[in-house]
Amino acid sequence: MWYACDEAARPRSAPIGILNGFGRALGDGIVGLQALSVAILVGALPKRPILFRLPNLSAMVRAIYTAADFAETRTLPWHFATNERPFEPDEPFARVIDMRDFAFDPDFHATAMIDFFLRKLGVQPGSIPASRRRNTWLASRVQPVAPDAPPGYILICPKASMRLRDMPMEIHAHIVRKALDVGPVVTQGHAPGTFVKNLIHAAPSTSLDALCGLVRRARLVVSTDTAMVHLADAFNVPCLAFFPTHRPEWRVRDYPHCQAVSLPSRLPLGIEFARGPEDEQLARSAWFPDGNDLGWLDRVMIPMLEQCAR
């Protein structure tokens, strides 16, 4: 939805406002800011639009928007959090693009995330080359800090922002076991107690530069559907990504270094929030299509591990 301001009251230099651009999650922000950088590049939007963001976001999410020097960020008061209440700006805007509650938009559940954001910003996705639909905006705007880890490690990311997409402990342990055959492993999850040598538990990153450094220095990222997949693309790091709730092409279609694995389940495709404990159980069962036999996991992992070991 777009709001147009009164022509007589609008100065020639009136800015563009974007409400809730681009949500509260780190991954959504990385992809949404790529769409915004493209919209500015092709002239669909003027330079430095104003992003109205809800308060009390995590430090890492705030850091992503601070890095995006092509936009200004302001606070969106909670009483304007949903589109049930028309936005009342304190100053004239050329137009206001309303992305409030986009997580509940049916189109968001059934299309590539980058395409969704581009269309919201007035850009036809098909007019943009695949190379511009990748997360190219970020790498030049951060200074990755190398982690305290051996060189050539494999980074495992089992946790997502939603428990619905978390990697089960048994899957995490199996991936760790196989990855240790190749070299040192850094995991963001709980380090299984049976693995000691060459296994490092990554403490939560204290800055965006540290998080980017953790990804940038990895030779391979193995992750569930989370922001780490988008960061791996931003730094051209090979990635093996698992998708228990979304079609992979809705997330990583344009990522040339990402091998995506779809995990079919009886959940509605594109579900964003668990409706109850049974949904979490359905998501978990998608990781075990053959019961306790994890041969399917070996078949997708081993070729990637062999390739990164060369």
Q: Language model features by range: what are they?
A:
Residues 1-310:
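Catalytic machinery of carbohydrate-active enzymes
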